[in-house]
Amino acid sequence: SVGNIFTFSRSAADHISERVSNFEIDVESQDSIQKAADKIKDHIIDRVIIASGILHTENFGPEKSIKDLNYETFAKVYSINTIGPALIGRYFIPLMNKDEKSIIAFLSARVGSISDNSLGGWYSYRSSKTALNQIVKNFSIELKRTNKNAIALALQPGTVESKFSEPFKKNVSKDKLFTPDYSVELLSQVIEGSSANESGSLLSYDGEIIKP
């Protein structure tokens, strides 16, 4: 059964259920992340899911060639896709259940796989997810020493109907373009079905382990 649910976002929102509490967090601020964790430090956490991510804004899009490489773009993408999630791990992993199976899962991407990269491009996004996958692997190794019941996962959600994927969905077949609810359902099954042997891996929405 589900107990309390804590959600964190850029702006706190009201929820229908009394079991759901929402707090503000800025994934680009270490102080904000630490304060967010402090707000639930008296609770034992069974599941932590990090869904922050950036691919494009009004000011930039994924790079198509080396001529598009830009310091500000790299800094912004790494800040949200890599550094923020790493710091969330730092402050939330110590709150995870040590007596029963607990899981921390990060939304990543197949394009972060070096062996799977045959198209090139998307320099900052690809490499930010590659770095995130390495961080998740590191978390899994450390958790073997500090919390043997904890699992760290990176997740490939597929292409989900959202503002995030809007500019690119024309290249995706209809059966591979998921609604947010369906994507959540698939990823929930992967998370709940995961084992200690898969800790540190990048798992696809269908349960496939994606090679680094």
Model-derived regions: residue spans:
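Conserved glycine-rich Rossmann-like NAD(P)H-binding loop of the short-chain dehydrogenase/reductase
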Residues: 1-16
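Short beta-loop-alpha junction of Rossmann-like oxidoreductase domains
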Residues: 14, 115-116, 147, 156-169
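Rossmann-fold cofactor-recognition segment
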Residues: 15-32
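Hydrophobic structural elements of the Rossmann-like NAD(P)H-binding subdomain
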Residues: 49, 105, 152-155, 165
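Catalytic loop of short-chain dehydrogenase/reductase
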Residues: 54-58, 62-83, 98-146, 158
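Conserved internal alpha-helix within the Rossmann fold of NAD(P)-dependent oxidoreductases
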Residues: 84-89, 187
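A short, exposed helix-loop element centered on a Lys and neighboring polar residues
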Residues: 89-90, 137
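C-terminal helical subdomain
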Residues: 154, 162, 166-212
